[in-house]
A protein has these predicted regions:
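Primary detection of the long, small/polar-rich alpha-helical "axial" segments characteristic
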Residues: 1-273
Length: 273
């Protein structure tokens, strides 16, 4: 091989190979520091597109889970209020039974207490709210529980007042009960109201069960999508460490060889002395 001063082809070749190895080492370090196999579109354009689509789906599903949890909180708020109304109706029924026993009572005291309890039912109906929404408004509250616009669950409640107690099929009006003169009739009305409240609670319980099963299914779906996204985007650390070590050795070797190649012109100078 001839010795030349103007063109050091060995140094040029060594520099080119060193640049390649250094670039590979930099990419390997980037992957290891980020934990991702794909950090930009150039790494894997198709893989990045799939990964981003899966990420969007995962975020949507996770939000749907939060929506369903809000639905459960709404149902529990309504259930808690109905539980209190049920207890009040049980007390009014006791008062009606007591007032119906004319041998020991004229019903005045029982009637006074019953009317105060009915006011409390009205208060519960108007004051029970969830996130600013009146819970008992005879309107459906819709919860988005999936990525599709059709993935919704509607929770329906009814107006709740002593004058209009309904489960959607039957109704009861307790506003006119009078335990001084109509205790027996009041007993029937109150029992009808208790049945209505029980039906409402059963309907809410069914809605809560559906929401809970929906959350379970969404969580499973989210886990599966996360696993798929991880397989596409995440880095195999062990495999990458092997590549990193190889590229690191190549950079060290390339640096040494470039230094050796740069010494060749010096050898030519020695011949000229």
């Amino acid at each position: 091989m001839g010795l030349r001063i103007n063109q050091n082809t060995m140094a040029v070749s060594a520099h080119r190979n060193l640049s390649i190895s250094d670039g590979m080492l930099s990419k390997s370090m980037e992957r290891l520091s980020s934990g991702f196999r794909i950090n930009r579109a150039a790494d894997d354009a198709a893989g990045l597109a799939k990964s981003e689509t899966l990420r969007a789906d995962i975020r949507g599903i996770n939000q749907a889970v939060r929506n369903a949890q809000d639905g459960i909180s709404f149902v529990q708020t309504a259930e808690g209020a109905l539980d209190e109304v049920h207890a009040i109706l049980q007390r009014i029924n006791e008062l009606a039974v007591s007032a119906a026993n004319t041998a020991t009572s004229d019903g005045a005291a029982e009637d006074a207490e019953a009317k105060e309890l009915l006011k409390q039912i009205d208060s519960i109906g108007t004051s029970t709210k969830f996130a600013g929404i009146n819970v008992f408004s005879s309107a459906s509250v819709t919860f988005q529980v999936g990525a599709s616009s059709a993935d919704t669950i509607a929770v329906t409640t009814q107006d709740l007042s002593s004058a209009a107690m309904s489960d959607g099929a039957t109704s009861a009006d307790l506003s006119g009960i009078d335990l001084t003169s109509g205790a027996s009739a009041a007993m029937e009305d109150v029992r009808d109201a208790i049945v209505i409240i029980n039906n409402l609670r059963a309907s809410l319980g069914a809605s809560q069960n559906r929401l809970e099963h929906t959350i379970t299914n969404l969580n499973v779906t989210s886990e599966n999508l996360q696993a798929s996204e991880s397989r596409i985007r995440d880095l195999d650390i062990a495999s990458e460490m092997v590549s990193f070590t190889r590229h690191q050795i190549m950079v060290q070797a390339g640096t040494a060889m470039l230094a050796q190649a740069n010494m060749v012109p010096q050898a030519v100078l020695q011949l000229l002395r």
